[in-house]
From Swiss-Prot:
Subunit and partners: Part of the 50S ribosomal subunit. Probably part of the RNase P complex.
Keywords, comma-separated and alphabetical: Cytoplasm, Ribonucleoprotein, Ribosomal protein, RNA-binding, rRNA-binding, tRNA processing
Cell location: Cytoplasm
Family note: Belongs to the eukaryotic ribosomal protein eL8 family.
Primary gene name: rpl7ae
Protein role: Multifunctional RNA-binding protein that recognizes the K-turn motif in ribosomal RNA, the RNA component of RNase P, box H/ACA, box C/D and box C'/D' sRNAs.
GO MF annotation: an example: ribonuclease P activity
HAMAP family: Ribosomal_eL8 (MF_00326)
Descriptive protein name: Large ribosomal subunit protein eL8
Chief location of this protein within or outside the cell: cytoplasm
Length: 125
């Protein structure tokens, strides 16, 4: 299946897993925002440290505004394969199209590694 139009770079599966791990640790010991609307607000306010966007969102327009907004605000973002993965990492029973990490808590090391690898993938630091 072709990648949706809003997916601007490929993320290796192990890096997507690390991003979800950072989200889970941030949920337990730090601060996160769940869902597209909350993630959008966190980006606009400059609070987000990393934004996770699911690749299986339909319709695409729900999250299509996130990558350009993150780039404008210079906030790193990463794609993960499924909404279900983001939802589970957030402690939800349902999927979430996007989530933002505001405070990584004990997941700071994992978050820093993910951000470093994302900047290598995108060529931005």
């Amino acid at each position: 299946m072709a990648k949706p139009s809003y997916v601007k770079f490929d993320v290796p599966p192990e890096l997507a897993e690390k991003a979800l791990e950072a989200l889970k640790k941030a949920k337990e010991t730090g601060k996160i925002r769940k869902g597209t609307n909350e993630a959008t607000k966190a980006i606009e306010r400059g609070q987000a440290k990393l934004v996770l966007i699911a690749e299986d969102v339909q319709p695409e327009e729900i999250v299509a505004h996130l990558p350009p907004l993150c780039e404008e605000k210079k906030i790193p973002y990463i794609y993960v394969p499924t909404k279900k993965g983001i939802g589970e990492a957030c402690g939800l029973q349902v999927g979430a199209a996007a989530a933002a990490i505001l405070d990584p808590g004990q997941g700071k090391d994992v978050l820093d590694e993910v951000i470093k690898r994302v900047s290598e993938l995108t060529g931005k630091s």
